[in-house]
Amino acid sequence: MYMLSSDERARLKWACRRGMLELDVIIMPFFEECLDDLPDQEQRDFVSLLTSDDPDLFTWMMGHGRSENPAHAAMVDKIVAHNNSKLR
């Protein structure tokens, strides 16, 4: 499993900060609690997902649409499942 350097982690944490508070609330807990446990490819998928526009991310996270990129769609599913598990 790939371990991020402290600089890489800081840059990625900054990238998790979005222009919409709703996305911060959804994405940051996943970053803080799950990222280190993801396999290398899923970590790369997460980083790639963060390059998406906020309106697209919000639509996908709310379940009102799905990314055409299968890796992004799978990562959104993981993030949403993580957040839903915290509500139980």
Swiss-Prot record:
Domain of life of the source: Bacteria
Q: What single Pfam family name could you report for this chain, choosing any that match?
A: Sdh5
For the keyword Chaperone, the answer is yes
Q: Name one GO cellular component term.
A: cytoplasm
Q: Where in the cell is it found?
A: Cytoplasm
Keyword vocabulary terms for this entry: Chaperone, Cytoplasm
Where this protein primarily resides, as one coarse class?
cytoplasm
Cite the InterPro entries for this sequence: SDH, SDH_sf, SdhE_FAD_assembly_factor
* Transmembrane portions of the chain: none
* Gene Ontology terms: biological process: succinate metabolic process
**Similarity annotation:** Belongs to the SdhE FAD assembly factor family.
Role, per record: An FAD assembly protein, which accelerates covalent attachment of the cofactor into other proteins. Plays an essential role in the assembly of succinate dehydrogenase (SDH, respiratory complex II), an enzyme complex that is a component of both the tricarboxylic acid cycle and the electron transport chain, and which couples the oxidation of succinate to fumarate with the reduction of ubiquinone (coenzyme Q) to ubiquinol. Required for flavinylation (covalent attachment of FAD) of the flavoprotein subunit SdhA of SDH and other flavinylated proteins as well.
- Protein name per its UniProtKB record: FAD assembly factor SdhE
The record lists the organism as Photobacterium profundum (strain SS9)
Gene designation per UniProt: sdhE
